[in-house]
């Protein structure tokens, strides 16, 4: 019995060891699986979602002061915007971009910020922006915030502390000693964008501070790394709230030459009416477009990308405003900007431009932009004469052009209903393009219950308003919404682009894939024009079934009608979009089509 007991004890001991080893192995396997799952979850969390959502987007600029007044004070506000979110949903825009809403003394209508992380009381509260974001995201609408990094208000606590040389704030701005016997003369001839010296002497600090814009807008010193971190903290504050991206203001002015002893040279050809105090008098080689500016923008791109990865967010988009040369603007593509604003239809073209000039505006941008990037087209903004006033009678065709071209389209509020500038307001004060949105034909065009608004409502509001155009079969608003719907077609997302000068007055724009051609014909003259479709160089358009898809409000044929005999008549200042289906391709290079498809599938 003793030996039997020992035998069974030994057997039990061996089995226990085997079971223990198996348990240990199972635990190891479980641990391995847990580790793999944790790594997988970690990788999933460290991922930018929905990359490229912006590549074919329509961004809509909201000027908050003029969009919708919720409390009857005559000034638009955040609650007003929230109350009108359905408008964006109905039109189909991808994102709204809010002009500055930060706390500000309003010397430059919000572009002079005294607190980057608070809301100007005239627009509402932080809760109001939280509510706006919540409701916008419910309907799939993204919200872009204006970021003004070049300068602050002189009422910002940073500047007040810098004046007193308090700690790190001493060098938050660009301070220099004056020259001359009394040390009260500016150190050089640099002038402000708003004319006059860009240097202002501060009696308390006994030094000059630099300002590219108003003297109440001192420039920040980005050669101070603490200032760079401050701006990233501000970006994080808004990203934490759910902002989907930033439109970065006045980017070319972020840096100036470090050597302040150099004077800027006079331009070779200067308007005789200008003098040395005018900004347009000089070639701004020291106060604009410095290499460090591009590096700073790249650092912001790295920051938002890292934030999106760490928070498993959709790609955070950066749009940059730069009034500069084509080459300097295009360069931002290589330094982190998703959308370096293309202002060429504003700065390089107007109602007097011929077809060759319009074609060049398009081709020059397309030919210069890096492969794999997205083009963009801006027709108007809060600083320029409205599209409908710059191109009288032709606003429809310019919107059609913008929407047919590849890439991003940017709409300034009111363009979708054909708003124009208030005629009696001088264009150089910028107010003509900032009048209240025209919602209907009631008091103050439905913008406010108050008969007195911060700017007067345009007298034409009973004829041009959203309510009226929504109920009309043929209106600018109906055209606008149909164009946004049309942009969803594969051809307009991924098709190649061809521009053709059919005559001095007729421009053709073709978008094409292997199975479809979308053609836009624009008649810039006031006279009727006859267009032979064989001139487009497309056997598909001239031989395959071609139908009218959309026409400008002054086009005289109904959508859906087939084009017979390859001839189409365009009324004066009219435009039409045609769609042709079939296997034939245009005479453009098949290799170009192949590259277009590849870049659409594998964007850089």
List the model feature ranges, each with a label.
Residues 153-163, 309-312, 317-351, 420-429:
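Substrate-binding cleft/loops of secretory-pathway carbohydrate-active enzymes
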Residues 29-46, 589-603:
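Cleavable N-terminal signal peptides of Sec/SRP-targeted secreted and luminal proteins
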Residues 558-581:
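C-terminal beta-strand-rich structural cap/linker in extracellular carbohydrate-active enzymes
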Residues 46-236, 240, 253-323, 437:
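Acidic/aromatic-lined carbohydrate-recognition and catalytic surfaces
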Residues 259, 264-286, 295-315, 332-334, ...:
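Loop/helix patches that line or flank the sugar-binding groove of alpha-linked glycan CAZymes
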Residues 580-591:
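C-terminal GPI-anchoring signal of eukaryotic secretory precursors
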Residues 528-554:
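Beta-strand-rich binding/interaction modules
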């Amino acid at each position: 019995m003793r030996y039997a007991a020992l035998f069974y004890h030994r057997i039990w001991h061996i089995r226990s060891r085997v079971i223990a080893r198996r348990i240990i192995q199972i635990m190891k396997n479980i641990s391995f699986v847990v580790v793999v799952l944790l790594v997988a979850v970690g990788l999933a969390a460290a991922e930018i979602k929905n990359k490229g959502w912006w590549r074919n987007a329509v961004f809509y600029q909201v000027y908050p002061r003029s969009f919708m007044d919720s409390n009857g004070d005559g000034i638009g506000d955040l609650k007003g915007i929230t109350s009108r979110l359905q408008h964006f949903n109905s039109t189909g825009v991808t994102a709204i971009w809010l002009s500055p809403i930060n706390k500000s003394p309003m010397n430059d209508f919000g572009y002079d910020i005294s607190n980057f992380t608070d809301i100007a009381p005239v627009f509402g509260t932080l809760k109001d922006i939280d509510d706006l974001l919540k409701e916008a995201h419910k309907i799939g609408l993204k919200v872009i915030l204006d970021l003004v990094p070049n300068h602050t208000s002189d009422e910002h606590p940073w500047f007040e502390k810098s004046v007193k040389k308090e700690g790190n704030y001493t060098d938050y701005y660009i301070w220099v000693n004056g020259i001359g016997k009394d040390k009260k003369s500016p150190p050089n001839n640099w002038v402000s964008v708003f004319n006059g010296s860009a240097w202002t002497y501060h009696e308390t600090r006994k030094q000059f501070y630099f300002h590219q814009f108003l003297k109440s807008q001192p420039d920040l010193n980005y050669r101070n790394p603490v200032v760079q971190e401050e701006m990233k903290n501000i970006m994080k504050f808004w990203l934490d709230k759910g902002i989907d991206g930033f439109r970065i203001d006045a980017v070319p002015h972020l840096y100036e030459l470090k050597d302040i002893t150099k004077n800027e040279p006079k331009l070779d050809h200067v308007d005789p009416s200008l003098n040395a105090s005018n900004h347009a008098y000089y070639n701004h080689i020291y106060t604009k477009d410095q290499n460090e500016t591009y590096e700073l923008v790249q650092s912001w791109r790295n920051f938002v990308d890292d934030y999106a990865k760490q928070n498993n967010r959709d790609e955070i988009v950066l749009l940059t405003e730069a009034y500069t040369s084509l080459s300097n603007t295009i360069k931002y593509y290589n330094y982190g900007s998703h959308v370096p604003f293309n202002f060429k239809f504003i700065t390089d073209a107007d109602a007097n431009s011929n077809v060759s000039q319009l074609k060049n505006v398009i081709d020059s941008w397309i030919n210069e932009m890096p492969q794999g990037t997205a083009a963009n087209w801006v027709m108007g903004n809060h600083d320029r004469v409205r599209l409908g006033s710059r191109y009288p009678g032709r606003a429809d065709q310019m919107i059609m052009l913008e929407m047919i071209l590849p890439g991003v389209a940017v709409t300034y509020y009111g363009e979708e209903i054909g708003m124009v500038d208030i005629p009696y307001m001088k264009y150089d004060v910028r107010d003509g393009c900032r009048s209240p949105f025209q919602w209907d034909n009631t008091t103050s065009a439905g913008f406010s219950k108050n008969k007195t608004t911060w700017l007067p409502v345009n007298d034409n509001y009973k004829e041009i308003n959203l309510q009226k155009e929504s109920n009309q079969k043929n209106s600018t608003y109906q055209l606008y919404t149909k164009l946004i719907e049309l942009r969803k077609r594969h051809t307009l997302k991924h098709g190649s682009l061809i521009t053709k000068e059919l005559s001095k007055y007729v421009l053709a724009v073709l978008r094409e894939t292997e199975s479809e051609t979308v053609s836009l014909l624009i008649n810039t003259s006031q006279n009727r024009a006859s267009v032979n479709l064989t001139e487009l160089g497309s056997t598909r358009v001239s031989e395959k079934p071609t139908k009218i898809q959309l026409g400008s409000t002054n086009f005289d044929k109904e959508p859906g009608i087939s084009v017979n005999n390859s001839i189409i008549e365009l009324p004066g200042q009219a435009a039409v979009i045609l769609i042709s289906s079939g296997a034939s391709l245009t005479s453009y290079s098949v290799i170009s089509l192949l590259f277009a498809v590849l870049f659409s599938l594998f964007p850089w």
